[in-house]
Amino acid sequence: HYIMKTYHVFIASSLSFQKERDLMEKVLTERNNSELNIVVHRHEKNGDNDLAKGDTQEIINSEIRQCDVIIFFAGNWIRSKTIGEFNVAIENASNKHIYFYQNPTLEYTQEDWTNTTLWKDFYAEYMQKHLDDDTVIERYEKQCNTLEQLRDALVKDRESFLNNPFCAISCHKMEY
């Protein structure tokens, strides 16, 4: 009997990336078939007001811990809650694949946001400190500036998954 593989993907971002999140979810779930099941986890957050009642940060963090792939969307600025979610992902990174997509044209003025460039420096330093295996560091340092690059990164990252299910995404053109 063939065992269906299930992969859990968490999409972390602010509501500004609604379109990208919808598109990413569509591209991922279109791959589902009798041998593959991709489950997308996402929470609709707008500042401190969670639109889905009961979605506390701890619930979100526990989902991140259980997911195989985490995709972060950020603009020029990134919110402290998203950084917190990234930290949770990194702390549990031994079996995870982390992708960072940045849309540099998106700007924020809220006080609770950190400049993305500063965050990326912190991110690189954090990786070096917590993951001493060079191949692991290389595996996680994927910054994508366009959705095409994000799709390509998922497609090319074959060796880090056995029979990487995401290679099938290559037949889809991501429009945005």
Residue ranges and their predicted role:
Residues 21-23, 82-84, 109-112, 176:
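A short acidic (Asp/Glu
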Residues 44-46, 77-78, 94, 98-112:
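Short beta-alpha junction loops
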Residues 2-70, 91-92, 162-176:
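Conserved N-terminal substructure of TIR/SEFIR domains
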Residues 106-176:
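C-terminal interaction surface of TIR/SEFIR-family domains
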Residues 29-37, 92-97, 128-138:
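Structural alpha-beta junctions
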Residues 24, 59, 85, 118-122:
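A general structural detector for well-ordered alpha-helical segments in enzyme core domains, enriched
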Residues 51-52, 76-95, 107:
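Conserved TIR/SEFIR loop-to-helix hotspot centered on a Trp-containing motif
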